[in-house]
């Protein structure tokens, strides 16, 4: 998909995610202190700060890796009090990580397909015997992932094991896997860390 094919004219809507007075400590060390913000529909919101400022910890609070001692996270009007990363993903909150969490021996396409797991309805029997439901689901999932691959302009390396790819392309694959879950909120942790100028420019364009 070329740059001029990407529709950026999405209207900004009301709050989809609200972070209210979050505080998080590890022992006597305060990682986050009384922090609040919200994210509007179709908005890009950045959390900026030096290393150790608590940026990753904040994302971990949002998607359920950490539970803050104080404050709340509200998503679509629902307070996420006992959320886990899996539940967050099911509800439509997807993320990437500061340190890549890819399956290095799997191809770029197969890594992105992992992101479709939440949309899989076929059971073990359906898959084992390749029943129509499983075949239809596999076709739909591959089609969706092929669209993401085209959008991220990684068609030429989709069958390459991720471990053999340059770092910048691995970051694209990780973004693709997050997009494959079709999230409403996409949390990107240090999405351009370790990239050169050209790779950063490309990542900005995709975001």
Positions of PLM-derived features:
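Glycine-rich phosphate-binding loops of nucleotide-dependent enzymes
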Residues: 2-207
């Amino acid at each position: 998909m070329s740059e001029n094919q990407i529709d950026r004219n999405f209207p900004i809507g009301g709050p989809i995610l609200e972070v209210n007075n979050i505080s998080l400590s590890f022992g006597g060390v305060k990682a986050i202190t009384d922090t609040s913000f919200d994210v509007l529909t179709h908005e890009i919101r950045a959390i900026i700060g030096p290393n150790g400022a608590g940026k990753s910890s904040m994302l971990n609070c949002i998607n359920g890796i950490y539970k803050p001692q104080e404050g709340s996270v509200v998503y679509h009007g629902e307070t996420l009090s006992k959320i886990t990363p899996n539940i967050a993903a099911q509800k439509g909150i997807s993320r990437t990580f500061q340190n890549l969490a890819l399956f290095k021996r799997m191809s770029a396409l197969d890594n992105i397909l992992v992101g479709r797991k939440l949309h899989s309805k076929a059971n073990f029997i359906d898959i084992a015997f390749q029943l129509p439901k499983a075949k239809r689901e596999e076709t739909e999932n591959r089609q969706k992932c092929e669209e993401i691959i085209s959008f991220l302009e990684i068609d030429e390396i989709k069958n390459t094991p991720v471990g053999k790819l340059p770092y910048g392309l691995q970051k694209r694959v990780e973004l693709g896997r997050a997009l494959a879950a079709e999230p409403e909120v996409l949390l990107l942790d240090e999405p351009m860390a370790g990239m050169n100028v050209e790779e950063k420019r490309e990542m900005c364009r995709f975001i």
